[in-house]
């Protein structure tokens, strides 16, 4: 204390104080500011250390929860979008990017506020605005603004001079550069880039260890360096009932597309979407720009409520992982699937304005030259092989393996080559499936030999062939159709059915030829003359003729509706050419069969029955053909029953003023319908009449109850049951006030003990009531003291007494 310098009174006094006092005050203030800044810096360091520890040593589950808090309302999460951007600011290392980071935002700001502010500025508009939040929902003070192109981001930064004012606060803007992804891992199943700390794939749930083991080292670098861009992109996760118009509407803000630019792949059996579609653009640059726009959408692209995945149609991620041989196999399988989708969509949409070209490969793409060479070689080999089968069936055994190997490499030319086989024949579908049949232990390469006994077919051992839709029998090499129960031999191109008595496979055409020839039947019995059964070649020719007519009619309707594009014209020409070629081919066979039938037919004994008369080949039965001819003949004759010049109905012998009245008479008149029915029955033979009556009986509802009543009569109705009557038992209950209150009650005894005598009134001077109070019935709903509320009823009165008292009360009221 002695060493401290005491300030004198004169030094303390003064207007502004002494110089020493001012110096001490300045020193204390500077010391306080330094202490505050040191405390703030240390607190920031501690908070940063805690954040780093939380970020580095947290579990994957906690990290997933923290990142889920930053999701948008629709729940979309892109693994590696904003979480991979570097938040630290270094001006020297800043590079231009299409993503801009806004730092120093107010805590109360929202994403909608930032969007409204961005929309108020002129120039390019952002593609997405992302505000980073904590788990509690509070803003972390920075956000990301992403533009579609790098030029838009740089021009926007230059226009605002890297400064922005939001809610009166100056905001710093910087380019956001993503951190390197060398520590992330790529999923081998869905090709999604995942964080290094994620043990399972975010999209498909695949294990990280499996992906690292399957993908060889150096694959990721090779994938990034190879240029695998093409002019077609694929849309995945499409709803089963989505149409092309919905896809065009969803993509219209980003690209100008036509109907023929979109290929929606459908299932051949259910006619529903298979979950993906192709969008072809004019160039690879346009496809790359569209893909970049669609992948940067937040929220992502949605069509009919389904989130759509977008990628190049020919991606190098999967092709480079495979070996060269597997790559060619996958390449051909994909082409076959697209060709099959083209065939199914062409059949289902033939009446909706023509078919659409679903071919995926275009000239100039990778593998197109090799694929075209395979297609040409396969077609030449198939034509030679077909000629060899016609000349000598035994030559097929030496070339079956070659056919199989060629079908493995290129499976779709058989689908496009429609001029050699008519549509609908299993040749187009069974030939590609020979690649799968080589794995099964087939019998002889020549197939089933007629006349040889075989074991009973076991359908449980059959293998389903997706390319043809049939079931493959590995023991015989035949294809089984469960709908028609027929077998198809892909080598001889014949339909067969199983004969249980002979224990062999009998060709369908052979059975009809046996019926036409004079051979005696297997069962000998009474003689019966029958009309010949079906002529397979002749009826196939008629079916081909009807098919060609329908195609030509559809083509005429399509031309009259609107002018088609060139691709549709070529497709129509191919279909009409296939129809004409198929009709000419089967017409020759039909004429040959007709010439053979000109020989006088012998009387046949016994019944000739085809064991299988249903399904694919059973549709060519003789009865169905005669019915069609009969209907055509009757229709032509019915047209002659109307005289359109005189406007008269020759059948009903009536004349009409105009054409509309005649048509209305033919369609609505009961007289015309009755006469037409009589006319049709008169033109039929006895057998046709019996068949018609049988068909009508089968179609008509049979009232068995009416038949039973007509045969046995109506039984007499049973006597009604008498209702049981129960006598209600009388209940004796006490009525104490019915005969009046006597002197035996407790109240009377108490009053007598107090000096009261019967007949005198109550009270000291006996001025009170002399009779006991009686309960009276009041009128329902009447208030106390109202007129007519009570008319002297008591609880012990009977109904008769109550009526009498009520009548008397009303009489007195009237007076």
UniProtKB/Swiss-Prot annotation:
Query: Which CDD domains is this protein grouped with?
Result: OCRE_RBM5, RRM1_RBM5, RRM2_RBM5
Q: List Phosphoserine occurrences by residue.
A: 18, 59, 69, 72, 78, 444, 621, 624
Zinc finger annotations (C2H2-type) as residue ranges: 647-677
What's the superkingdom here? Eukaryota
Regarding protein family, the annotation reads: Belongs to the RBM5/RBM10 family.
* Quaternary structure and interacting proteins, as annotated: Component of the spliceosome A complex (also known as the prespliceosome). Appears to dissociate from the spliceosome upon formation of the spliceosome B complex (also known as the precatalytic spliceosome), in which the heterotrimeric U4/U6.U5 snRNPs are bound. Interacts with U2AF2; this interaction is direct. Also interacts with ACIN1, PRPF8, SFRS3, SNRPB, SNRPN, SNRNP70 and SNRNP200; these interactions may be indirect.
What protein is this chain from?
RNA-binding protein 5
- This chain is encoded by the gene named RBM5
